[in-house]
Amino acid sequence: MLACASALSAPAATWVPSLDVITDKACYAPGQMVTFKVVGTMPANTNIRYRHGLAVVETAQLTSNSWTWTPPKVDYQGYMAELFTTAADGTETIVGTIAVDVSSQWTRFPRYGFVADFNDYNKTVDKNANIKTEMAYLNRLHINGVQFQDWQWMHHKPVKFNGDGSLTQWYQDISNRWVGVEYVKNYIAEQHKYGMKSIFYDLCFGAWKDAYKDGVKPEWALLKKDASGRFYQDYHGLPSSWASNIYLQNPKNEGWINYMKDRCDEVYNNFDFDGFQVDQLGDRGEVFDCDHNKVVLYKAYEPFLAAMKTAHPEKTLVMNAVSGFGTDSIVKDNVDFCYNEVWGNGNGYGGAAEQDFANLYDIIKKNDQCSNQQRHTVFAAYINYDKAGNDNRPDTKVNTPGVLLADAVMFALGGSHLEIGDHMLTREYFPAAPLQMDDDLKQRLVHYYDFLTAYQNLLRGTSLDQSELKAEVTTSAADVAITAWPPKAYTMTTFAKRIEDKDVVHFLNFTNTDDLSWRDVNGTRPAPALKTDIPVTVKVARPVGKLWVASPDIDGGAVKELSFKQNGSDLSFVLPSVEYWTMAVVEYKNVEDNTEDGVQTNEGIAWSVKDIIHPQKSSDANNSTIYNCYNLAGISVHSSNKGIHVGKGKRLL
């Protein structure tokens, strides 16, 4: 079959990133109004276009630096707002972009951040001003959940009370840092203003020394056995200058579970937290209960999580699967999304080595399978780890290429990255901030998180098992070798999914590196070699209607529709550019059999019921009004740009 090149629906756009655009919230409920604001001077005759993927939902002219928009009442959708001007010859110039997430539950598309400093240092810093600045940046990244690390007093007694039952306003955490209750609460309030959820952190089995004074029983302890056969309580050693080591309890012990349920009640009764981030310490080897029976530790997490969820079913519950330890038990029932702290020397997932980019795929694949394709993955992955721990490091900057390539791969695979708080996370001790982001990285992350949010339905709308596609992609370019996933040194790596009537092909740029680890431990990853005008041929399944690309590295993530040629199963086009990551989306035509008796659609491509289409004037692909068709109420589609048109006198079969 031979098809001609498609026509572009609009003149090519240029990119002038002159406007800083913000929204009033990180995410929105269906039907909730979005308020936009432009910081700076907006060009005359600026228009805004709201897209869901390629489809234009609405276009309007802007007459003020602040305006509102109400997205369609469809749950779990991402949109990109493009601000643009149009010259006399029809050329568009895009002057700003920002994403919008419409989701009733934040855990459907979690974008997780953190906070870990609750001190004003004897009033030497304006902590409340810092809180506002930090949360405004997280809001610009559409961070919809925030983990509170090391906010608590003691792990076994997170809330500290005075003798009269009132909250102690200042206390010291395990590292002897001061924590101000006022600032914990102000962080929560500021996050809620932006529609974010506030999640408190604690271990599932940790207690300080002398915890018996607070009601922790010796018979709850988790034990180990030394070479002589002597049993002793397992513990996590900490610096001698800290308040205590952490002594481990048996997480399935009913007494300990009930004790921690009471402590969680105290947390929720005194702080407006929205959930519990449960932590563990990975594989502890052979461990025992107080009767010297072996404890299968990863299985012991199940009753603990079940009890926490039953006690507070309305609250978010998340647990860390450290290097994959306990994944099967953790993600199956009670948690709301998958959270994986990944390192470089362990691997509880199988497949590639834990430090490799390829292992990120293995993690998501296993999480999808263990959660019955129901829960998405967040990586707690510490970039530039060795540089951050080196007192003789040459500089104190986070390496931008290391961050962007790691995020590109994580996002393309369908995950997200816990990395942003008041600093970039580079060590497992969240309060540590040895490396800082420069302004360029901060701005580039805005585009990356816009991209993650705007295209969330294509990136994270389905699991790998449901959508993974072994795309066949070739190029005639002499300076580019294209290979399929997993990444290979000095190549352009592709990863693909088939989602409904679209093939989504990600191009990830490894062309100038043989470092295939996401960790960039020493902060030495070089910037990629920008590749432009790459001739590409992709194998496709049927006639193609439209082709478009988008990248967080160019045009603020805005859509660029491309021309193409199709010869049978070969789709040929020119890929405009790949710096770190470019996404190409192939949209297939809908195949119909227009007979005298009825209209038929091929098996396997019919849309499923989700929302009702109410009668309205319909449009064809070129936005020209169609009057000789009926709209059918009661037929549901997945996104606002799709519809089913049946000619007069026809039947839908």
Task: Spell out what each predicted region is.
Residues 479-542, 582:
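Carbohydrate-binding surface patches
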Residues 104-128, 200-271:
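Active-site-adjacent "subsite" loops/lids of carbohydrate-active enzymes
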Residues 594-653:
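C-terminal outer-membrane/trafficking sorting elements
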Residues 94-154:
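An acidic-aromatic substrate-binding cleft motif
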Residues 280, 374-463, 511:
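Aromatic/acidic polysaccharide-binding cleft in carbohydrate-active enzymes
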Residues 252-337, 343-362, 369-372:
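Active-site neighborhood of glycoside hydrolase catalytic domains
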Residues 567-593:
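C-terminal beta-strand-rich structural cap/linker in extracellular carbohydrate-active enzymes
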Residues 134-182, 206-225, 237-255, 281-293:
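Aromatic-lined carbohydrate-binding/catalytic grooves of carbohydrate-active enzymes
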